[in-house]
């Protein structure tokens, strides 16, 4: 491109047949937080430190469902906090972000993202700021949401072991371009592109074994 950004290609972001790059802003506002929700990688910076958790979880309802009463919003928020497996939802509801752990904050973000029952949940590196044990718990939670609610999940991650546990289809990107795409098993067991092969080869052997065992275990208990 003329500004040194490389070649410029025609781009589209299609959602149910509509190009989101060329639609009315009012249409986008209706989608955001309602049909499409996002969970970011650092919940502490995504949550407002001066508002209680309950108020923030309810925010999408105030925007997209103003017909609901305060009591109805609270009840739905408490239900979601319970569904994301937070103990003592009432206490979490009344808490401020700094009063709960990083893993709990990320579960809160997932609850807020799911409160309007979106068709698509974009999870942008949602486990990066968490320790390994909590990472695994969040991935299992996302998988259950996908299976029980039918919500499509776009999971963005550099951690291939987590990708393998959660995803059914994988798109490998390098420098903003698609290198390879296909079913999860095909990508991990028979990668075609050299870049993908190097990524797979870089996964520690113990992680590969554990990921495979976890996938089989989840399938057996699913």
What positions do the PLM features span?
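Single conserved hydrophobic/aromatic residue that forms the stacking wall/gate
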Residues: 1-9
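ABC ATPase "signature
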Residues: 181-182
